[in-house]
Regions:
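Glycine-rich, small/acidic residue-mixed loop/short-helix segments
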Residues: 54, 203, 208-211, 221, ...
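Glycine-centered loop/turn motifs
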Residues: 40-41, 114, 130, 136, ...
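Acidic, proline/glycine-enriched N-terminal capping motif
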Residues: 1-57, 61-64
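A short beta-strand motif that forms part of the nucleic acid-binding face
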Residues: 30, 73-75, 83, 229-231, ...
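Short, surface-exposed ligand-recognition loops at beta-strand->loop->(often short) alpha-helix junctions
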Residues: 16-22, 36, 106-110, 241-248
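N-terminal auxiliary interaction/assembly segments of multi-subunit proteins
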Residues: 49, 74, 302-304
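Anionic-ligand-binding alpha/beta catalytic cores of soluble enzymes and soluble regulatory domains
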Residues: 149-239
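Acidic, low-complexity central loop/insert segments
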Residues: 3-9, 13-16, 59-184, 255
Length: 305
């Protein structure tokens, strides 16, 4: 993405979370440390089943008198439902505000430019993952997972065109954003196909800053920490690129007649649950492999050493 390009993500949902016990409520159920969230820091996080299986992922930022949760729009109501399940008598409000807000993607370079504008004079905020600008009507934050995904402007829908004009931005297709995310090894579409099927940590949340292993208890904290600290993580979600044929969900991926993984998300961008040990992932990364009746290769995200 060039510095003056922008992408409107109209497939993102938003949940406003407030109330006297909003902070403690979130701290007890999500994987990241809510205490670290400030007006200048946004976090990526998730919620697991009691067995440690993946459910949903989202961003959490300070917002008005509480927090704003950003997620895949089609799971907004499901997230509210699971949060309500754990709410019990807790003093917290959960409101779907997806019809009020939108997500405007800008480059990290544009974020840097914004911090240097006259009304931001004196600001020393670095362009690091999660760095957040709290303006009067908008929140602007660098993607907490990987700053190569740029920054997000969270704004009221009716202000979208004014922001684009004010920042001298040109809209491009959102496929550019999702293709970049695919190459970086970060799935963002059709994540419901992972729900309750993989351990949360297998979706690379540890590598993407989505889990704080030093915070107190959250749902399935003990098992998740055990997998990480005892080096028991044997599979990860990785991008799978088609060489020939078609890729389908549950297709088996083989290397030298050994089953090393299977497709868990087939469209629009394919991801597989892939072994990282026995055999070592370095043996088969970026080489031609069989996948059902097709040929594929597993891409190497930058965080794989």
């Amino acid at each position: 993405m060039e510095i003056n390009e922008t992408i409107i993500l109209d497939d993102r949902g938003f949940v406003k979370i407030n109330g006297d016990e909003a902070k403690s409520f979130l701290q007890n159920i999500v994987t990241n440390d809510i205490e670290k969230i400030t007006d200048s820091l946004t976090l990526f996080s998730s919620i697991f089943t009691p067995q440690g299986k993946y459910l949903y992922e989202f961003f959490i930022l300070k917002f008005e008198d509480g927090y704003l949760l950003e997620c895949e729009k089609k799971v907004t109501s499901e997230i509210i439902k699971i949060f309500n399940f754990y709410k019990l008598r807790t003093k917290v409000n959960l409101i779907d505000v997806s019809k009020k807000y939108t997500n405007i993607i800008i480059s990290a370079e544009k974020f840097k430019e914004i911090t240097k504008t006259p009304h931001m004079e004196g600001l020393t905020l670095p362009c690091e993952v999660g760095s957040t600008l709290s303006c009067e009507n908008e929140r602007i934050y660098v993607d907490p997972r990987n700053k190569n995904l740029g920054a997000k402007i969270i704004s009221k829908i009716e202000n979208t065109e004014n922001i684009i004009k004010k920042l001298n931005l040109k809209k491009i297709d959102k496929k550019n954003y999702y293709e970049k995310s695919f190459v970086l090894g970060i799935p963002q579409l059709n994540l419901t196909k992972l729900k309750d099927k993989i351990f949360g940590i297998e979706n690379n949340l540890d590598e993407l800053g989505g889990i704080d292993f030093k915070k107190g208890c959250y749902i399935c904290q003990e098992n998740t920490s055990r997998i990480k600290l005892r080096n028991k993580l044997r599979r990860r979600i990785l991008p799978v690129k088609k060489i020939s044929g078609e890729i389908y969900e549950n297709d088996i991926i083989k290397y030298k007649d050994m089953e090393i993984g299977k497709i868990v998300i087939d469209k629009p961008y394919s991801f597989g649950l892939i072994k990282v040990v026995d055999p070592d992932i370095k043996e088969f990364i970026n080489i031609e492999l069989s996948c059902g009746t097709s040929k594929v290769k597993i891409l190497k995200p930058e965080w794989i050493v």
